Amino acid sequence: MTQMTDAKSGITTEEMKFVAKEEGMDVETFKNLIAKGYVVIPKNVNRNTKPVGIGDNLRTKVNVNLGTSPDFIDIACELKKVEISNKYGADAIMDLSTGGNLPEIRKEIIKNTNLPIGTVPIYEVGADAKAKYGRVIDMDEDLIFNVIERQAKEGVDFMTLHCGITKQTVSALNNDPRKMGVVSRGGAFLTAYIMYHDKENPLYKEFDYLLELLKEHDVTLSLGDGMRPGCLQDNTDRAQIQELITLGELVDKCREKGVQVMVEGPGHVPYNNIEANMKIQKTLCKNAPFYVLGPIVTDLAPGYDHITAAIGGTLAAVSGANFLCYVTPAEHVRLMKEDDVKEGLIASKIAAQAADVAKGHSIAWKLEKEMADARMKHDWEKQFEIALDSDKPGKMREEIPSKDEKACSVCGDYCALLMVEELGKR
């Protein structure tokens, strides 16, 4: 049984009750969204995961990517990133490790959080194929599905799988060449496999078998966008849309089988094209939850891509995206460090909150009203408690204090709020 099959059968699970309460929603209404596939709860049956809802009519959620690379392998560092994710309000974590003992790293990450954990299994497949055969492109079907099954048994809650990379998608790419080609690692692995062997993508060819594996453990399928644009010039081209059409067809199959599914979206999109991209996805994929990387709205800001992504992410979430994958200042430059994780997470949470306010979500507005009340009362402790980052503003206030404990050092004696407040007392 999965959350979706239960919902279709009229069964209300404890996870549904928990998430509905968190979202301030009637549980029957929420259950109906699960049954239709408009909302997912990524929660493997083999793991005691905190239930988190992702999808329409819910608060916008934020994911943190972390993990090793062949150039930097330090489990302690990754666990510190997990700690930061837990502390500053991530809704999910993806382990994208590609260096070191991948099962051991994943095991430690899972052990140190109760947040939903996602992976991209093709990374481990590629590492295993390289170790066994010497080349990533020599991976085979057995290796692919063995890794997926093993990770499902370990408790992974959702998996990015690039099932929409097909011979037809690769043909669309070849017929409409891009500036930057394929920038998705998983997408590149499978594109290279198709081109070298002249074989169909096993994840697409054996999709029914894949669904059986995922359904057994109630792993949520996150349909990866292997043809996402890697620069603004490549946005919304034929390869991207061809893959999205295929993903829409696969969403239908997932729902028929009772497998929870969400769809991943583009990374580099001009601001004026973001709304159209969200509407295309929601239409082709029949309102499946949409999970976007950014989108990044300019390619000119390496070192500041947490900002470019927050700008794009806000509009994306207002226009239909449900799940924002954070982007850190290290994007396009190097592996993220601990401080990068915090900055990227806070930036994405700002985007999510701004979007939820724009959509009129009651919980988002409740927080905004509480902050306004705290500011009006000069209650600095309450302000910092409500803030998305409770640590930074307190430290900043201590750096340049005001003589008046109610005011801040920008205005001091000339504080507008205090001035009008004093006049009101006379």
From Swiss-Prot:
**Note on cofactor:** Binds 1 [4Fe-4S] cluster per subunit. The cluster is coordinated with 3 cysteines and an exchangeable S-adenosyl-L-methionine.
Query: Which residues bind substrate per the record?
Result: 65, 94, 123, 162, 184-186, 225-228, 264, 291
Q: Does the keyword Ribonucleoprotein apply?
A: no
Which residues are recorded as binding [4Fe-4S] cluster? 408, 411, 415
> Which positions in this protein are listed as binding Zn(2+)?
268, 332
Keyword Lyase appears in the UniProt entry:
yes
Functional description taken from the UniProt entry = Catalyzes the synthesis of the hydroxymethylpyrimidine phosphate (HMP-P) moiety of thiamine from aminoimidazole ribotide (AIR) in a radical S-adenosyl-L-methionine (SAM)-dependent reaction.
Q: Which HAMAP family match?
A: ThiC (MF_00089)
Give the family from UniProt: Belongs to the ThiC family.
- This protein's name: Phosphomethylpyrimidine synthase
| GN (gene name) | thiC
